[in-house]
Amino acid sequence: MSWDQVWIDINIATMSPNISEPYGAITDAALAVQDGKIAWVGKRSDLPEFDVFATPIYKGKGGWITPGLIDAHTHLVFAGNRANEFELRLNGASYEEIARSGGGIISTVNACREADEAELFELGRQRLNALAKEGVTTVEIKSGYGLDIETELKILRVARELGKHHHVDVKTTFLGAHAIPPEYKDSPGSTERSDAYVDLVINEMLPKVIAENLADAVDVFCENIAFNLEQTERVLSAAKDAGLDIKLHAEQLSNMGGSAMAARLGAKSVDHIEYLDEDGVKALSESGTCATILPGAFYFLRETQHPPIDLLRKYKVPMVVASDYNPGSSPLCSSLLMLNMACTLLRLTPEEALAGMTRNAAKALGIEDQVGVIEVGMTADFCMWNISTPAELAYTYGVASCVDVVKNGHLVHQ
């Protein structure tokens, strides 16, 4: 017998719920890869005999293998930056005040409308490289910085191209309903103009996105500075009817009931959720919808309202941890930093945080049958870390500990 690869002198955090040990751990382990899949995993003492002359053997020097990390919420393709708004916030301006004065998302929209695809691709490639160096093997990229047909399609095309030219898998999300463009700004007491923009998203943008196969999912920002509950449901329902997965930015600044509505529609995830209440948590539990925690935005905006972690535990809602990398509220292109922040700021355990970037993140993207755990038959996406315990991934930051990355059975970083 021979395999494409065999890994020995390792410990494995499989993250499998089928193994009762913390992290689904197998110590003194071995792992075999064949045809891009995990062909065998278990104790090294149980490893079947194989042709050592025909099989490449990799020695982990006692380190740990984990599933490849999955960043399930990013806005990675954009132009420009918002360093000036950073200074405004430090001088007392709120996120909402900046947004209402024409800053925030709209300032990035203007930069993206001016940028061409080549510029956006190069910027996205650099950011994707940064995540890949930290063991990320799958990433979600949203649009939402165009807010017109041409630019929304441009951003999604760039995201698709990044996936074709990089070893990191890219899942794309259409977020045309990210903010209300200035040209559709409502008069006081009216939603006529923003309703017209929602019509544009549903009737013109979405069909073009589908025609070019540019999105795996559709997202909406449901908040008092963006889209109301009725508008949000219209967009999500249209996406669901078109056969796309749905997800939602919800309960970041207030409790509008978006999470419960999205759960009723079968959303894969609701994200941010600082103001999520117990009824909303129950709705997520009943629908199997994931709750995505975004500690980078919580930190950068200096928020004080914590996501309801204890309630999510109580009702066994899968918790996802993601970077929310974007120029305004989380300009932090580091998944490992998010693991640390999830623990130190939001009180997740290191095991919960790692599950949030592996097993649960895969569920949020609808790819839990392919990646996120190390089990026989799963895609061979995994990382080799120079650590003594998986908790180190959340405990320390700034020390390069990712030694190797295997993607689809191929060693891509060594």
Swiss-Prot record:
Cited Gene3D superfamilies: Metal-dependent hydrolases, Urease, subunit C, domain 1
Reaction(s) this enzyme catalyzes, per UniProt: 4-imidazolone-5-propanoate + H2O = N-formimidoyl-L-glutamate
Name of the featured protein: Imidazolonepropionase
Keyword Iron in record: yes
Family to which the UniProt record says this protein belongs: Belongs to the metallo-dependent hydrolases superfamily. HutI family.
Requisite cofactors: Zn(2+); Fe(3+)
Originating gene: hutI
GO biological process: one example: L-histidine catabolic process to glutamate and formamide
Any one GO molecular function term: iron ion binding
The species this protein was found in: Shewanella pealeana (strain ATCC 700345 / ANG-SQ1)
Chain's role: Catalyzes the hydrolytic cleavage of the carbon-nitrogen bond in imidazolone-5-propanoate to yield N-formimidoyl-L-glutamate. It is the third step in the universal histidine degradation pathway.
Compartment(s): Cytoplasm
Binding site for N-formimidoyl-L-glutamate: Y145, N326, G328
